[in-house]
A protein has these predicted regions:
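Alpha/beta-hydrolase active-site loop
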Residues: 89-108
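C-terminal catalytic histidine-bearing segment of alpha/beta-hydrolase fold enzymes
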Residues: 54, 90-92, 189, 197-235
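Gly/Ala-rich beta-loop-alpha elbow adjacent to hydrolase catalytic centers
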Residues: 117-126
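The feature captures the conserved acid-bearing segment of alpha/beta-hydrolase catalytic domains
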Residues: 157-208
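Short, surface-exposed "cap/lid" segments of acyl-processing enzymes
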Residues: 23-71
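Active-site nucleophile loop of the alpha/beta-hydrolase fold
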Residues: 141-150
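Conserved alpha/beta-hydrolase
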Residues: 71-88
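C-terminal motif of bacterial Sec signal peptides marking the signal peptidase cleavage site
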Residues: 16-17
Length: 235
C-alpha cells in the first residue's frame, strides 16, 4: 500500500491558492509518497520531484492520479510533490529551495536517479533547474510548460533577429542551443489546443521526436491527466 506523508503543509494552505496568503517558507513544503512504510535502500530507488502549475498546490498530482501513474510504471520510484507556488518564482528563490531542501539531500541519500516533473509554471521551473544544475537531474517531464512571453520567442516564428537584451527569465537563448546531452533529458507533452501550444511546439522541435507527446486538449488537468501516463512511458 502506498504511504503518504505530509511534511509541514497546513490544511489551510492546501485549501487556498490566493497569492497574498502564500509564503516562501524555508524549507519549502512538500508531500512525500512512497510505496511502503518500510525504509527502502535509496541506492536502488529513483526519485521524481513534482512542481505544480500556477494556482495549484502540492496535492494536485495525487488528486489527478499522477502519483498512481508513476508508481504503476515505476514501482521503485519515490515521489516528492513540492508546494512550489508562484511566490517562490517571484522571489527568484525556487531553484535555491529545490536544491537545498530536496535535490541535494536526495543526491546525498544515494538515489540512483532523480527526475523533475511539472505542469505549466512547474514545467518552467523544471527547465530553470535543469539549466542551472544539469548534472543533478537525469530527466525532466514537463506538461504544457510556460515558456515566457511572446516577445521572447516570436522572432523564431517570424524569422527575425532575437531581442538584443533578453530578460533574465527568458530561456530561449538556452533552449535553441541545447547540447545533445541536455536535449536527451527533456520530455514534453501538451494539448494541441493549449494556450502554450505554439512555444511548446518550438521547444519540441529542439528535441528528439520520441520525446514529445501531444493530443487534442487545452491547458487543464483533463488533458494533462491523460498525457502523464504516456509521457512517463516514453523514457
Amino acid at each position: 500500500m502506498r504511504l503518504k506523508t505530509l511534511a509541514s503543509l497546513p490544511l489551510f494552505a492546501l485549501l487556498t491558492s490566493c497569492y497574498y496568503l502564500q509564503s516562501t517558507s524555508i524549507p519549502i513544503k512538500t508531500i512525500h509518497y512512497t510505496q511502503s512504510a518500510e525504509q527502502a535502500d535509496k541506492r536502488e530507488r529513483q526519485l521524481m520531484v513534482l512542481l505544480p502549475g500556477i494556482g495549484d498546490r502540492a496535492g494536485v498530482f495525487d488528486k489527478h492520479g499522477v502519483i498512481d501513474a508513476i508508481h504503476t510504471t515505476h514501482p521503485n520510484m519515490d515521489v516528492i510533490a513540492v508546494d512550489a507556488h508562484f511566490k517562490y518564482y517571484e522571489a527568484r528563490t525556487i531553484i535555491e529551495r529545490l536544491r537545498q531542501d530536496i535535490i541535494k539531500p536526495a543526491i546525498d541519500a544515494g538515489y540512483s536517479a532523480i527526475y523533475l516533473g511539472g505542469t505549466s509554471l512547474g514545467g518552467f521551473g523544471s527547465l530553470l533547474y535543469l539549466k542551472q544544475y544539469p548534472d543533478d537531474i537525469n530527466k525532466i517531464f514537463i506538461l504544457a510548460p510556460y515558456l515566457g512571453d511572446a516577445q521572447d520567442y516570436n522572432y523564431l516564428i517570424e524569422n527575425t533577429a532575437a531581442p538584443e537584451v533578453p530578460r533574465d527569465v527568458n530561456l530561449w537563448p538556452w533552449l535553441i542551443q541545447l547540447p545533445d546531452d541536455v536535449k536527451n533529458k527533456i520530455y514534453i507533452a501538451y494539448g494541441t489546443n493549449d494556450k502554450f501550444a505554439v512555444p511548446n511546439g518550438l521547444l519540441a522541435k529542439q528535441l528528439p521526436p520520441e520525446h514529445t507527446v501531444t493530443q487534442t486538449g487545452k491547458h487543464n488537468w483533463k488533458t494533462w491527466a491523460q498525457l502523464w501516463p504516456e509521457l512517463l512511458a516514453r523514457q
